């Protein structure tokens, strides 16, 4: 059975939504630029040999609608290339990599593009979740319960299933973070410390040249060039973040300093069979060892990385001790902290260059972005095995184990 190997990655800088550096770029234009950058790194590959373009997008509507994956293929002049658009919210472009893995293992193709995009700035044109009066009335009581809890002080999370009630499938991510923090006993100070850690590590990694290794500069409509992420800030300290007000509840613990911002960005990964890579004389960057996906209550979705990672590790025949570097998407410190603790991850192996709290989290981009970052990190720090994982809106988790090959 063939192995699935990664031969190229590319990503854009990550912009702040609505006010940042990429706010004037369309998602299709940005995605095409980044896919072309990834393909340019493997000139040996004939584009006509690509079997499918699978594009992850968290909210595929508005400018991100019309099956964006196929739009991008045509935009790049590849009418022969099929294209699909996949949403699994925050893990959309890890899902597309998983689909490439499965297709290669099944012998149904040799070369796939797994890409991801989210341009939240362009949501002013609409998105797939913003249409009015579309929620199922079945969840009305659960939504009202979420709203009531958000206004109360001192509320702790209780699984509604234990009372014969349905959980809130539409719950806002910030409310799930507050629920999880209380349920798992995470404090505001711990969350702030983790947020500061992310910014400080990103600041150090920028100085060391780590982040610039993976960023493809992007040209804006006005001709200016963006070559770095908007999010990282120098000199962030506990004193500086301590006074920030909570975002989601009067007595909340989630602040702008301990969760990710809203962002714009795109990333791409070129995945092929090891037999095709050998045929082309390519040395792969990494091998996809295994993946995992899990579900749990939507109201505590942030704990999703735990079971998903355990699945992926079991399928890889590895333990967490075998993993050299771990990337957990930093949607909220409130969920990364209990996830890494439950998994038994050494903090010295976790998000060692900073994470999404600093660099950002464009939903559909994140899976492919973290794959590229993890490969970059395994090379930069000379390590072998990496684990990528994230929580997923709606109460899910996803994970992938990779092995560095070059």
Give the location of each predicted region.
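Flexible glycine-/small-residue-enriched beta->alpha junction loops
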Residues: 111-179
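Condensing-enzyme catalytic core mediating Claisen C-C bond formation in acyl metabolism
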Residues: 1-27, 149-156, 163, 238-303, ...
């Amino acid at each position: 059975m063939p192995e699935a190997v990664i031969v190229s990655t590319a990503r854009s800088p990550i912009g702040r939504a609505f006010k940042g550096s990429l706010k004037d770029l369309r998602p299709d234009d940005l995605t095409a630029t980044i896919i072309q950058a990834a393909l340019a790194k493997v000139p040996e590959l004939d584009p006509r040999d690509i079997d499918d373009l699978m594009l992850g997008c968290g909210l595929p509507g508005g400018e991100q609608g019309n099956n964006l994956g196929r739009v991008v293929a045509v935009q790049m002049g590849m009418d022969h290339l099929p294209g699909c658009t996949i949403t699994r919210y925050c893990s959309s472009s890890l899902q597309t990599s998983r689909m490439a893995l499965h297709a290669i293992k099944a012998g149904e193709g040799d070369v796939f593009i797994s890409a991801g995009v989210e341009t939240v700035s362009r949501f002013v044109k609409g998105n797939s979740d913003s249409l009015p009066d579309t929620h199922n009335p079945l969840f009305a009581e659960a939504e009202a319960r979420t709203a009531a809890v958000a206004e109360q002080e001192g509320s702790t999370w209780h699984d509604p299933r234990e009372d014969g009630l349905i959980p809130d499938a539409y719950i806002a991510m910030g409310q799930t973070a507050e629920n999880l923090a209380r349920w798992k006993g995470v404090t505001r100070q711990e969350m702030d410390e983790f947020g500061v850690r992310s910014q400080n590590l990103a600041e150090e990694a920028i100085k060391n040249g780590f982040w610039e290794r993976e960023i493809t500069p992007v040209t804006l409509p006005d001709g200016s060039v963006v070559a770095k992420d908007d999010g990282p800030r120098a000199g962030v300290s506990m004193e500086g973040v301590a006074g920030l007000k909570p975002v989601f509840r009067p007595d909340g613990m989630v602040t702008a300093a301990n969760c990710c911002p809203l962002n714009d960005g795109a990333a791409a990964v070129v995945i092929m069979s090891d037999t095709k890579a050998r045929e082309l004389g390519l040395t792969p960057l990494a091998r996809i060892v295994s993946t995992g996906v899990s579900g749990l209550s939507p109201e505590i979705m942030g704990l999703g990385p735990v079971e998903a990672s355990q699945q992926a590790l079991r399928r890889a025949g590895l333990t967490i001790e075998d993993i050299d570097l771990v990337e957990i998407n930093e949607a909220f410190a409130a969920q990364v902290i209990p996830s890494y603790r439950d998994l038994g991850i050494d903090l010295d192996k976790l998000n060692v260059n900073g994470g999404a709290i600093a660099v950002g989290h464009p939903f559909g981009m994140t899976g492919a972005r973290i794959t590229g970052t993890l490969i970059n990190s395994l090379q930069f720090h000379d390590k072998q095995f990496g684990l990528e994982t994230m929580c997923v809106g709606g109460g899910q988790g996803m994970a992938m184990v990779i092995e560095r090959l070059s």
